[in-house]
Amino acid sequence: MRIIKGIVAAPRRILLYGQHGVGKSSWAAKAPNPIFINVEDGLCDLECDKTPVLRSITEVYEALIWLGGEEDHGYKTIVIDTLDWMERLIHQAEVELINDRKIKTLADVGFGKGYPRAIPHWDVTLKYLDHLRRVKGMTVVLLAHAKVERFESPEADSYDRYSIDLHKTASGMLQEWCDEVLFAAFRVNTRTEEAGFGKERKLAVGGKDRYIRTSESASCIAKNRLGLPSELPMDWDAYAAYVRKPSVKEQVQVGARPASGNIEGLVVNGSSKSNGSSVGVVEIETPF
């Protein structure tokens, strides 16, 4: 057995989630030579390379297979924008497979058997992303929106905090897989003013300064494996300064091959507006 000693530098697996309009996509666009898997349809005004808007989970898989194929496409970072919109495609595909007019969402499936149907999709997605990272040397950036949910602490009273806007099983899988789970937010302070009749009220002030939380706190879910400071500026370079640069490129040899079918015109360059065309639905087989 080959023994690996010390630190091994490898492409990062990053999940960045945050409030609407905080600049998640703009942050990811500063990563090395990124290609966006365009699921949410919010990239028209962002200068980046992107796929057309992908309307089914099959199209997402096909895009991932194309990136992992034998062609040297030159992209260094894959960005999925966003995970919560991708989850909708997964749930939509499973509802269609059930083929029951009474079932509109996976929540409608009885005995708690609905949402577990999505787990194999996330397993396949992580295998595709592992392939891109290990064989193609691509950094993986996963973007998602935030939600406020109740956290039942075993050590204190329950309280609200920000979490990833995904079903809890999918959220747990992705958090475990990623090296960094980062929370992006606007910095808001409060001030107190007189409200009359001897009462006071608090007002929110600020809201323009943006920052990234890198470690768990009472307000949000977060983690990192780089020893990052608890907060970073909302800037890719501020994060990248802590990433170890690989000295030796190691590859795991797997049987990679491109997807079947016509995939010409998959990538939309620059800030050109997507016409929403799809890349076609094909039978998907894993490339490894």
PLM feature spans:
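Short, well-ordered beta-strand core segments
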Residues: P34-F36, V140, V181-F183
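Long, low-complexity, intrinsically disordered segments
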Residues: L266-F288
